[in-house]
Amino acid sequence: MKFVDEAYIDVIAGNGGNGCVSFRREKFIPFGGPNGGDGGRGGSVYAVADRNLNTLIDFRFARRHEARHGEHGRGSDQFGAAAEDIVMRMPVGTIISDAETGAPVAELLEPGERILIAKGGDGGFGNLHYKTSTNRAPRQKTPGWPGEQKKLKLELRVLADVGLLGMPNAGKSTLISAISNARPKIADYPFTTLHPNLGVVRVGPEQSFVVADVPGLIEGAAEGAGLGHRFLRHLQRTRLLLHMIDMAPFDDTDPVAQAKAIVAELKKYDPALYDKPRWLVLNKLDVVPAEERAARVKDFVKRFKWKGPVFEISALTREGCETLVQAIYQHVASYQTHYVDPDVRFAEPEADESDDEPRFAPQADDPRFR
């Protein structure tokens, strides 16, 4: 299935049904009084997080999502039926924002999470509501309230514990296929990976973590060069970044220069992403002659001025992969809860204790509170 991580949709909630003006008419009862029913509630639009989805492709081609209107009220105290709600299933990790203003609406972080994104209109009142001791035959009614209409932007950020970072052809896809159940396309040319791949790494019966492989970065990615900049947002929810280095490039490129370029692009794109825990993974050491391996690794670490964890592996032969997997799991397991950091745009401001206004105040134009 094609991977789509961005889509624009229109959601339209249903209008409430109109109230009814009606009077009781029966034999020998000349003044039966009002019996007009209320209108039904319009259908609302909900978003639900589905763990079985990993793309927004369904919303790329079906942009308009409209709920039905509520039924009108009728005589004999018959209230209109409420319209059925619309439930849109989206991948876990979807961020919903206003397409016109960019204001955040909601984000789906937990499987099964259900969020209201467009509320259906309330039904109008029938004349039964306006009967008083002085007005025995009211002819007032109210129309149904309109439902909300919104133009929304959907943005998917995959939920993974570990993200793979590096230049094209650094061996990221080979590593994720070696340690997990993912089977991405692997070839001996750059930009083989065109969209993010997720893999679940099983450490034990109930011990696992999720790895995300994104397309490789090149210099200038923060300004739009290459493919990686489009998918860097998928690394923003990870707990750990693995910076993979090709220690045996097929041309005469300098691995240190490439590594510094990646770090620079990461810092330009998002300082918070740059500040995440990052480990150095030196790959393709099976190609390096055994007598040169230690010297080449030492030279790289010295010139790169790296002081963090370093792992020497060969994703192709799986040499050193088990040690890396165990270390990753220990790091991920140190986070006792599975809480996902929400997007900073959704941080709720602290309540002002000096605010004396009621938390739930009736709207001034609501006829029910006049």
Curated annotation (Swiss-Prot):
Keywords: Cytoplasm, GTP-binding, Hydrolase, Magnesium, Metal-binding, Nucleotide-binding. It is an enzyme of class 3 (hydrolase). Residues 1-159 form the Obg domain. Residues 346-370 are annotated as: Disordered. It holds the Pfam family MMR_HSR1. It is found in: Cytoplasm. The keyword Lipid biosynthesis does not apply. Monomer. This is GTPase Obg. It comes from Methylibium petroleiphilum (strain ATCC BAA-1232 / LMG 22953 / PM1).
